[in-house]
Structures are given as C-alpha cells and as structure tokens.
Amino acid sequence: MSIRCTLLGDAEVLSHIAFSAKAYWGYPKHWMEIWKPQLTFSPGYFEKNESWIIEVNNSPIGFYTIQEKDGNAWIENLWVLPEYIGQGIGKRLFLHAVSRSRLMGHLILRLEADPNAVGFYKKMGMHKIGERESEIEGKPRILPIMEITL
C-alpha cells in the first residue's frame, strides 16, 4: 500500500471512487445523480489542488484533496472505495492530510463533513465548530463543519 501525488490522468478513476463512496451511505439514486457533478473531477481540478492517492497493487482505492481557505487547510475530498471502508484506509489518508497540512504551515485543518462521516472524523480528533445549512429537493440538510488543531 502506498500514497502518491495525484496525476492529471487520475481524474476519471477518482471520480468513480468519490461517487462509489458517497453511494455507500445509501442515498437515493436520484440524489446521487444530483450530486454527480460535484463528484466528477477534471484533470484541471488536480492541477489546482493538493491531492494524494492511496493505492493497493498500483490501483487507486482512495484519495484526498486539500485546499487553502482563509489561511487554514481544508479537506475538500476524502473518499475510500466501499470495499475498503473500515480497514484503516481513511485513517491513513486523514493522517497523511494532517502531515501535509503541517508541512504547508497550517495550524488548523477543517472540513465540511457528510453527516454519515462525523463519527469517523471525531475518532480522528476533530470536533464540530459550526454547521452549514443545505438542502436537496427541498429537504433541509445540516452539514457539520469540523476542525482539528495541528
């Protein structure tokens, strides 16, 4: 198992990983179609954002992306293929993101969590600092904003 920098040619497989990981939570298929544009990445996205892939036998099984906003590091994506969830892959990616954020000189790492992932991020040492209201098909959704001091 290894972690490497994302390459421009990885966009399609990483889009598949993100879509599959989001679908793992049992969201309705029509919601998944609404979210598909947000889960589809262009090569240009990875040129502009620090992104890392975890691989098994040279096959990508997960990735994360960090962006800088307001002087803080933000995890914009952290996705693991469903068949690898619960095997420590997300933890390895998260710890790598923490390390990279420190190397970039950040003191705080934040993210907007899918409600289903809050427990995972709490185990990683993050805590809720706020929330963002969202909606899908007129139904309200609350997305927790979480952070960890680096």
Language model features by range: what are they?
Residues 84, 88-96:
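Conserved acetyl-CoA pyrophosphate-binding loop and the N-cap/start of the following alpha-helix
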Residues 59-67, 74-79:
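Conserved beta-strand in the GNAT
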